[in-house]
Amino acid sequence: MDEVVVLAVAFFGAALLYASVGHAGASGYLAAMGLLGVAPATMKPTALALNILVASIVTVRFGLAGHVRWRALLPFLVGSIPMAFVGGALVLPGALYRPLVGIVLFIAAVRLFQTARAAGAAEGRETAIPAIPAVIAGAGIGLLSGLTGTGGGIFLTPLILSAGWAPARVAAGISAAFILANSIAGLLGNVASIGSFPAALPVWLIAVAIGGSLGAELGARRLGTPALRRALALVLVVAGLKLVFLG
């Protein structure tokens, strides 16, 4: 099967599944491209472009459902946007980029397992988000997002849930808007990478738009199940192993 079609199907599935838990799918897109040996120069801008579209869809859907708390989001963005821009401007050689993305995928897999356990527990408690820790956390996540081509939601959601700062759907809504801002900042940080967009990008954008719309509709009503998150984590582990050890 043609690589463009294979990736379109993979991206559709990633967008559907990730949008159902309030994310945009960057780690899934990177995993698919990594498994098929796509060049790092193409992986990063492609993942960010797909992320921007899906995160926009998810943010609107979760926002309309009342799950995005903009004031709670603000301190995270104060730290993350400039650092995502800086990270996006840094172009790592393939020998460093692939292992780094592989490690990020491993961490993302662990976080997915954690959210599978934490989502239910977090519903019963909620505390105010402290501004300074939120800015610091946002800065660290933003830099990593810009460097790798992810949106950072896979790190922010578990943090919010484990700290008891918001219930699961609100955590997902905050993360969706956070992902959107970081993805835009990361892509703007390396405008030159826009020239590395593959010719198949319009096809993939259509695929993720459909998948993301279906997933966002599902997620705004019923978040992805723990079993689904564990399955996604397994895929990320396989892709991470490939990137770290095989390049």
Residue ranges and their predicted role:
Residues A47-N51, S175-I179, L201-L205:
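Short hydrophobic/aromatic, small-residue-rich stretches within specific transmembrane helices
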